[in-house]
């Protein structure tokens, strides 16, 4: 899988932190996030899922993720936003690629991307969260186009 190494700025994010099998928690988190965004007239810059764990090493019931939107740096959390966290995704060097996800199979492009990175002779994965940015509304289109970001360090 082809990818680029990019220098990314930090992103301020607002949304929900969930623990459990990603195939359940990510959908649940985005359902909550959509309601919060609509109810508070939030204007998201991006829709993002942040992944904190390696599913090959961490049991499914302990997998952590955030379902979030990027917001301006000076974002103030509105009243009645229980459960919503405002934090940031660190800036730095990331390997970045784009993939189309069909049939809710987000795992395959991630495994392909990670396997390509493991073969890289110049960069290695950093022990920081990975994330994906949604480029379209898959619930409407029937597929998702996503940008995948993996933090990297020179070898």
Swiss-Prot record:
SUPFAM superfamilies assigned: Probable bacterial effector-binding domain (SSF55136)
Keyword check for GTP-binding: no
GO cellular component, as recorded: cytoplasm
Main location: cytoplasm
Subcellular location: Cytoplasm
SMART domains associated with the record: AraC_E_bind
Function statement: Inhibits the supercoiling activity of DNA gyrase. Acts by inhibiting DNA gyrase at an early step, prior to (or at the step of) binding of DNA by the gyrase. It protects cells against toxins that target DNA gyrase, by inhibiting activity of these toxins and reducing the formation of lethal double-strand breaks in the cell.
Protein name: DNA gyrase inhibitor
A matching Pfam family: GyrI-like
Keywords on record: Cytoplasm, Stress response
UniProt entry tagged with the keyword Transmembrane: no
Family annotation (PANTHER family): DNA GYRASE INHIBITOR, TRANSCRIPTIONAL REGULATOR YGIV-RELATED
SUBUNIT field: Interacts with DNA gyrase.
Any GO MF annotation of the entry: DNA topoisomerase type II (double strand cut, ATP-hydrolyzing) inhibitor activity
Family to which this protein belongs: Belongs to the DNA gyrase inhibitor family.
Signal peptide: none
